[in-house]
Amino acid sequence: MKTYKTSVLVSMMLGIFSTTAFSATVPAGTKLSDTQVFRQNTHSDPGSLDPQLVQENTAAQIVIDLFEGLIWLDENGQVQPAQAEKWTVSDDGKIYTFSLRDAKWSDGAPVTAKDFVLGWQRAVDPKFGSPNANYLTKAHILNAEEVMQGKMPLNELGIKALNDRQVEVTLTQATPYFLQLLAYPTTFPVPHHKLAQFGDKWATAQNIVSNGAYQLKQWTINEKITAERNPLYWNDKNTLINTSEYLFQESLASAYQRYQAKELDLTWVPVEQIPHIQKHTPDALIVVPRLTTEFYTFNVAKPPFDNEKVRKALYLTLDRPLIAEHIIGLRKPAATLTPPEVDGFSAPNIAELNQPLTDRVKQAKKLLNEAGYNEKNPLQFEIFYNKYATHEKVALALASEWKKQLGADVKLRTMEWKTYLGERNVGNFQLSRMSIDAEYNEPSAFLNSLLSTSPENVGQWKNKKFDQIMKDAQSTLNDKTRADLYQQAEQLIAEQAPLIPIFYSPLIKVINPAVGGFPMHNPQDYVYTKELYIRK
């Protein structure tokens, strides 16, 4: 059995070389501002602050400040101990035993193993309806699939409290990326005493307590959330930012204006402003590689995209370099759903995408003709996306390209984030904008979204061959075999076109140069405010 804890030797085994696992690391000689307030744009109101209900990254950013799981990911994406101060792993890699710190909720109640068990059980409880119900199946938690489907009771899930301070997790197979998965809110604890008192309303502004570095101070709907340091956080003494504000500014242009007016310290960048920033304030621009794919998914349960030939025609005629490199900029054209940089992935050669666009257009027109579409009966459909300047540019480019190349009649429909999510999740669309920000660094973080049983499979493409490929990939212990299977999965996506990969997107933002400690090498886009500080 292997034991992991916070020590120099074991930290080196984990790829962590700092003896201080938790603190805002301030270089010697740095003068700190008297006002340690960090203000970031998180786009829109979170759907919920309940860890098991989080489904958008902007909400997750707030939740990872308010709450803390068993581990966290440092600036290099490496696993660090969090609520668990150490853990052991069985020799077969299937059983993890976590020893918890003497930690407290913000109301003084102790954080117990029961809190983690309840959190994980809620995630797969079919009566609760978590949008990430399949998350624990990705980690191969024992009986997660069966519990999620209502075939087994909650207490059969592979997590149990050995005592108040020990959590035992059982997997169905050794999973190299298991610990990485524990950084996402779905695996965070919930306060069992608050759950007993308020039920699922425990996470409202009036009732919420948290176990992270920050606690909720105020939630002004459609404006901002303000959080302040949690004095009961186990490592509060090493936290420097006193107040963290999350502003809801959907307009990139307006957010950038607020940044220029020094009302924001961190926000996304309007595409048209990037050249100006690169020329005049390059130190303010941050471009961090991350594991993110922007794509459009077809609803294969509705015409016209229940026809594979129609889907394939659009897939072939998209000018990815034009959109990624010129219309949007600083993005990489995507040929596969999984980015090439993902660990354990060797991107297949999608030969047809290497053909000249003119040849692909000819092939696409032939497919449309076979499907019954021509100049007299043009293809008609609707593009659906959430309101956001970049998404608007992409949608307009798609409509323009398909009109130009195929004579398609394309309409646009856009909605605010929450409404868009609701419509998308119930399948009220024909072709919808989507993106995946990997929760862990492995191809299944992307490909699992297309499993027939996945709640993320809103396009309803169901393919038994794909499901079997993914099952085989997850069960093999041979890295080469697994990589080959992932290639096969991507080839099948290219053949049947349930979606159209468009580009891989880095994190592109402007930051107040006075902010220190920002993670520049975490490809999973985790930014913990407790690691930041403000210089004078």
Features from the language model and the residues they span:
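Gly/Pro-rich hinge or "lid" segments in bacterial periplasmic/extracellular proteins
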Residues: 78, 145, 150, 154-156, ...
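Extracytoplasmic/peripheral linker and loop segments enriched in polar/acidic and small residues
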Residues: 26, 31, 160, 357-358, ...
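N-terminal lobe/hinge region of extracytoplasmic solute-binding protein
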Residues: 41-91, 209-210
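Alpha-helical secondary-structure segments
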Residues: 113-119, 164-170, 212-213, 240-243, ...
